[in-house]
Amino acid sequence: MKVLVFYTRRFAYKTAEQNLSDEEIALFYPGSKEIVHEAEHTNCITAFIHIEAEDEEKGLKSREKKLANHLKWVARKNNTSSILLHSFAHLSASKASLKFTAELFHAVEARLKNGNYEASQTPFGFFLDLNMEAPGYSMARVWGDL
């Protein structure tokens, strides 16, 4: 799993182009969960996350704990409790299945919320128009190979 985390004063997105089929997107949105096509977040950790095939071998619980702990650590270093998960499958050639990726993202979001963090996800299966304001200090950008 590769993770590029930014502390962002402001992170806004809007869906631009759907890049997966409706059936593939449905894996991320079970039941009637609605896709939020546009949102703005402030004072948050924005995590660009790439789940790799090897992560499936390590298991969901292991990967969930590792990623959640990493994100909480970065959040504490930046004095925020708001964390935004963004699927970014451009950090490695290896890719996990969509099903595993969806399960992991939902599990991490739930774990963060259970730990009193404000957690959410950008829309999965879309290219997004992004607008990001990130300050220029060391802990505002953290790379992780988890």
What label would you give each PLM region?
Residues 1-20, 44, 132-146:
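Non-catalytic terminal extensions that flank enzyme cores
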Residues 9-77:
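Conserved mixed alpha/beta catalytic, RNA-binding, or beta-rich assembly cores of soluble enzyme
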Residues 10-12, 53, 89-91, 123-128:
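Active-site-proximal loop/turn and secondary-structure-junction residues that shape catalytic pockets
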Residues 59-63, 96-103:
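Alpha-helix N-cap and loop-to-helix initiation/capping positions
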Residues 77-82, 118-120:
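Flexible, glycine/charged-enriched surface loops at secondary-structure junctions
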Residues 79-95:
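Short glycine-rich, basic-tinged beta-strand/loop micro-motifs
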Residues 93-98, 111:
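Phosphate/ribose-phosphate-bearing ligand recognition and processing surfaces
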Residues 102-146:
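Divalent-metal-activated hydrolytic enzyme cores
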